[in-house]
Regions:
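Histidine-centered, transition-metal-coordinating active-site segments
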Residues: 1-93, 100-550
Length: 550
């Protein structure tokens, strides 16, 4: 029996019995309460969740696989010796379950997962030595590995048969086969893995680009997936050494769509994901999750014996209920409820509650984009100061978010402890303390500069900063090294990098070191405006005059 789900983007999505059983499971329904992005701080309508996204990925996966299978059978009828039906079912289950292991607030919370996923996956597939070996190069992102583990559990629990469990795991975590035996079949299976977890274009990325654009209204361009999918196949490529081999390829009609997908991804990363309001909100969520984790482990220390509450068990319906802990199907609402109920009266929790729910308390950015920052930085700060100050900010970002009197006192106290350790007779401890002390002195200088600036300008000591490791670099640079090929004809298959029509935007070595946002209170911003001063420019000029490079 086929069930239909109404989707605002794809109209109706057909779901067969085995897939319906998966969707009905509590672990899958949990995804209704895991937000897809952190964009709602900037785009209030961005309320879509991992549930709807996963259904969308499943739908696109079915369409892409059907087109690919049809094209390969037509172009190379005897190439694949495996079972296409089994391959399709495995792939579609991976599409459906690829995010089932996401933590609360999606990517913001996944860093709290433990990092021994290779061993955890091996326990569930002990006979797959090849997979264990191939995982030496990585097991994907933390949520991908957790999704593979939870997904495998659900498949077995439901008794779903006629699938390749190893391929299911590989597709979710993006680990391709490296063994060259049965290379024809492995090529098809590796291409299938890339359809879900590719470097530049896959059904996961396509759905989130389309869906994010739909709910935010940030529609950069139309992504014609029908045209893209219709031209996906394999082709004979003759490399520079005159060796001929099969490669995944798109028909030439897909050229414009590939560029559009790359461009849409660039714009979303540059103008949405790294907008200061979104980064600020994500930082608050990050602090809230850490606070929740710490609170739960202290309150239920006898039952919660693992390093963190972010475990596979916490994602299940049973959870820790049997141990007297109100923790199961862990999702966003657990973190929100923790902030709302006020049970945790620690200073940090009280501050977080106020910051998260009262928007008037939030500090505002002094510049709104990386582009604006880069222009100001290049204009005002010399190269030596730029690098030295950025390095100090990067050091402070490990433990401080706010720049205020309280945080400055903590930094001074920490310096005293380092000074004591630097006098230790233990040489290792002494050397480590001396190295840390130099960095700490730069951190304290940052506090002093901001404190003196606010005194000179008659402002409150309320600042915050966020250091952003990412620097905008177009995905076109990745296309230059990608494994995407275009088939112009049977005898002319060209790497996509050779037909690029848009130049890659390259970051300088200095820019690759990251950038930062500085925030201050509305009151401070209004005071500077009353004085007719550009707050961002003034603070960078003050840093330029007073920062001495080490």
């Amino acid at each position: 029996m086929v069930k239909q789900i109404k989707d605002p983007i794809y109209e109706y999505v057909d779901i067969d019995d085995d897939f319906t059983k998966v969707i009905d499971m509590p672990e899958y329904q949990r995804l209704r309460n895991v937000i897809q992005t952190s964009y709602q701080a900037l785009y209030p309508s961005a309320l879509h969740n991992r549930f709807t996204h996963s259904i969308g990925v499943f739908h696109l996966g079915r369409k892409l696989f059907a087109s690919f299978c049809k094209n390969v059978k037509s172009d190379f009828p005897l190439f694949y010796h495996g079972d296409w039906k089994r391959l399709e079912k495995t792939f579609l289950l991976a599409c459906l379950l690829h995010d089932v292991g996401h933590s609360p607030f999606s990517h913001t919370g996944e860093k709290f997962y433990k990092d021994n996923f290779r061993e955890e996956i091996q326990k569930r597939l002990p006979a797959n030595i090849e997979l264990y070996r191939d995982m030496e190069h990585g097991t994907g992102k933390p949520h991908e590995a957790m999704s593979a583990i939870v997904g495998l559990k659900l498949i077995r629990q439901l008794g779903i048969s006629e699938i390749d469990e190893e391929l299911f795991v590989r597709a979710i975590i993006g680990v391709r086969y490296e063994e060259k035996n049965d290379s024809d079949d492995k090529l098809i299976e590796n291409i299938t893995i890339g359809m879900l977890n590719g470097s530049l274009i896959d059904v996961d990325k396509l759905d989130y680009l389309i869906r994010d654009g739909y709910v935010t209204g940030f529609n950069t361009m139309s992504l014609d997936v029908e045209r893209l999918f219709a031209g996906y196949t394999i082709a004979d490529y003759i490399d520079p050494s005159a060796s001929k081999h099969k490669v995944p390829a798109y028909k030439r009609g897909a050229l414009s769509v590939i560029e559009n997908v790359t461009f849409a991804n660039d714009l979303e990363r540059h103008w949405i994901q790294n907008h200061p309001s979104i980064l600020y909100d994500a930082k608050l969520v990050d602090l809230a999750i850490a606070s929740y984790d710490s609170f739960m482990k202290k309150k239920y220390k006898d039952a919660l014996t693992e390093k963190t509450v972010f475990t596979q068990k916490a994602l299940s319906l049973e959870g820790y209920i049997g141990q007297g802990v109100p923790l199961s199907l862990l999702s966003d609402e657990d973190i929100i409820t923790y902030l709302k109920n006020g049970e945790d009266q620690s200073a940090e929790a009280v501050w977080l509650r106020k910051q998260y729910f009262d928007r008037s308390e939030r500090l505002k950015p002094l510049w709104k984009s990386e582009s604006e920052f880069s222009h100001l930085e290049r204009e005002i700060l010399g190269t030596a100061i730029r690098r030295s100050f950025k390095a100090a900010l990067k050091a402070i970002s490990g433990y401080a978010f706010f720049i205020n009197e309280s945080e400055m006192e903590k930094a001074v106290e920490q310096k005293k402890l380092m000074e004591e350790a630097a006098l230790s007779e233990d040489e290792d401890l002494k050397n480590a303390a001396q190295t840390s002390l130099q960095a700490q002195e730069a951190v304290i200088r940052i506090f002093h500069i901001f404190n003196q600036f606010r005194l000179d300008m008659d402002l409150d000591f309320k600042f915050a900063f966020l250091f952003v490791e990412y620097h905008y670099e177009s995905n076109y640079s990745k296309l230059q090294n990608s494994d995407i090929y275009i088939e112009f004809s049977k005898n002319r298959v060209i790497p996509f990098r050779d037909v690029l029509t848009v130049a890659a935007v390259q970051a300088s070595e200095d820019e690759k070191n990251g950038y930062y946002y500085i925030f201050s209170s509305r009151k401070n911003i209004e005071r500077m405006q009353e004085k007719g001063l550009d707050f961002g420019r003034e603070i960078l000029m003050y840093i330029s005059r007073n920062w001495i490079t080490l």
